[in-house]
């Protein structure tokens, strides 16, 4: 994570991904792998049949993490050696926008995915989120959909690691309204997809 501007500094206490599917049925592949017919092929998303059951997933942030601006090295909000494992899936991002707010209550009803972050964000000495003594809960639309190298839209796939880089500069409240307080910077999320490698 980084802040969106050099005048900003942030403090993150917790992060949750909300409204992801959390259970289903997995069919063990029986087809043989093309490259080695002594083994079954690797699992695919189509081997999963997901149930309509949704949950929150928390990344384990054990203490306050300070984040700095874009020119700095990114700060990890999660432990690379303790990745968060979730089921392969496509999700629908929380549909709130700066001009058409949608509440968190509606997002939960419609199973729309978002990040719930407890944090402070300071811009040039002024608190945009939180205060000296308290964290504020901020929400960001989030989805599991990305573009693959062939420009196909897909969700999370088995056998890959998905790394998200968040540039904090804004966020939404629980009613879906943009929290700005004087800043014109927004928050963006970049995705990197890597083949899974055992550490």
Predicted features along the sequence, with ranges:
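Extracytoplasmic cysteine-anchoring/structural motifs
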Residues: 1-199
């Amino acid at each position: 994570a980084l802040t969106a501007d050099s005048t900003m500094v942030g403090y993150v206490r917790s992060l949750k991904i909300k409204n992801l599917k959390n259970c289903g049925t997995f069919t063990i592949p029986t087809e043989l792998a093309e490259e080695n017919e002594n083994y079954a092929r690797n699992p695919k998303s189509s081997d999963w049949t997901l149930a309509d059951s949704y949950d929150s997933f928390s990344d384990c942030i054990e203490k306050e993490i300070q984040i700095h601006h874009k020119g700095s090295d990114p700060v990890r909000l999660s432990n690379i050696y303790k990745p968060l494992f979730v089921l392969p899936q496509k999700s629908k991002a929380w549909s709130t926008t700066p001009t058409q707010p949608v509440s968190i209550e509606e997002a939960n009803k419609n199973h729309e995915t978002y990040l719930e972050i407890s944090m402070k964000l300071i811009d040039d000495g002024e608190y945009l989120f939180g205060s000296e003594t308290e964290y504020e809960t901020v929400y960001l639309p989030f989805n599991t959909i990305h573009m693959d190298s062939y420009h196909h839209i897909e969700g999370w796939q088995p056998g890959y690691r998905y790394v998200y880089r968040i540039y904090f500069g804004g966020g939404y409240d629980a009613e879906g309204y943009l929290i700005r307080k004087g800043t014109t910077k927004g928050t963006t999320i970049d995705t990197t997809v890597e083949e899974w490698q055992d550490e």
